[in-house]
């Protein structure tokens, strides 16, 4: 087994590191730099440029220069974020089997293929640096990357000729690099604001254990968004002065993007900067120049809501971890965008403690990934990395309820099973709808996928035992299987492609769950009362039909009337929990005489005892 490299495949820049000689080292690229621009360009001569060389020619070749590809990695074409990216990016985004892809000179490329070209460059540079072949890697992703995005990242590694040993979360990787030598237990918060993504994670480190307590973020919030605010401001100012919509000119837009990024960087150390773009465009009156001063105060006002959005996520993640701000002992700042003074100022003010800037924000994630590579190879001993799943996972059960199988915050890898049953007599198949989210009702959560388990042996409802197993691997990739315990027949689905969950949806789910908590609980109580009533009516009717001859006519009619009344109540969509419970209670009391008659019948069959492991929920 050769050396395992750790790769931070970033939106704006990428970095790599290796663990050797009992320490993690950043690997410089062939240009001698510790980071490589995550940019790929296709020239008119048929060349493919990656990194610095691609960045240098971007202004003259904007439509064939691909940057921020991570923003559409694993994204479905019909998602709002894809439409947003389409407006912002100069290259053409197209629909390929429902997923986002790009078109260059009539040829379609997937985000995995473009990312693979970046990874190939990193792989070649690492081989040059190490003097040996590199075939294995640990690659990092934002903590809030969904299953589809994680799989796409792993596929990019495969295309690049790398065996991706592990996909790990960026803030967790940073904590691994920061906390490896910490002997005393510390609760640290990693604030990771990169070029295109934002993550905040609260972890406990110490004694060579790095355990994630809670994580949150937004896979579509980063330095690019800060740049875009400057671009929009400059374009609006230019239009007011000249009447020209500069954003319609892709070459001008590329120049504007570079100028906005440089202005943002300059304002990290200066209070004012001048943006000077001569001959940015032209009209009938002649060439036009863009010259504009931008103060730090104006930049901060343009981006204030973006910074505040990160603060609100910090608050919710600390709450999810079951901690208070005072219990956070260190705040580790990661990602190039944390150099923005206002970001540092707001995080410091919110947490009320000095920020830890001892780590290089551009390199620490790759360093942590290389340490994880060392762990997997056996070079790093006794280090335990415990990550978590960001949202609950479950299936839809009778009445449209979301029944959770794996709870949010469960340490991964994880494998959990529950036993369900059928909703109808002699039901030949069950449909398993896999869900992700925090709401009580299935329709309010994200559907990840659906599959059918066929060939269930004929049996009364509630008798078949269908074991549903959720298996999340160490990369956070989910497989769901279902098995009929009586026949042994099974079916499984590996969640992928269109089943991915966008990060904006995740955030909305968490917020909606909080807002609708009481309402959802009431709805669930009504559904559970209806399910219980339906089960009682069904079972009592079956028993009455079988033992009616052992009852006098008045008792039999009383029980039948109670069954009918309960069935009418069940059919009424507006029936309340109290009404359902009253009718259920009435039938229970009426059916006591039926129970006595059955007990008195010497040859009455004893009902089969319900399996203790069977969950009181049914699959439609």
Swiss-Prot record:
Induction: By stress conditions e.g. heat shock. It comes from the Bacteria. The gene is dnaK. InterPro entries: ATPase_NBD (IPR043129), Chaperone_DnaK (IPR012725), Heat_shock_70_CS (IPR018181), HSP70_C_sf (IPR029048), HSP70_peptide-bd_sf (IPR029047), Hsp_70_fam (IPR013126). SUPFAM superfamilies: Actin-like ATPase domain (SSF53067), Heat shock protein 70kD (HSP70), C-terminal subdomain (SSF100934), Heat shock protein 70kD (HSP70), peptide-binding domain (SSF100920). This is Chaperone protein DnaK. The modification Phosphothreonine is found at residue 197. Acts as a chaperone. Residues 593-620 are annotated as: Disordered. GO terms for molecular function: ATP binding; ATP-dependent protein folding chaperone; unfolded protein binding. Keywords: ATP-binding, Chaperone, Nucleotide-binding, Phosphoprotein, Stress response. Belongs to the heat shock protein 70 family.
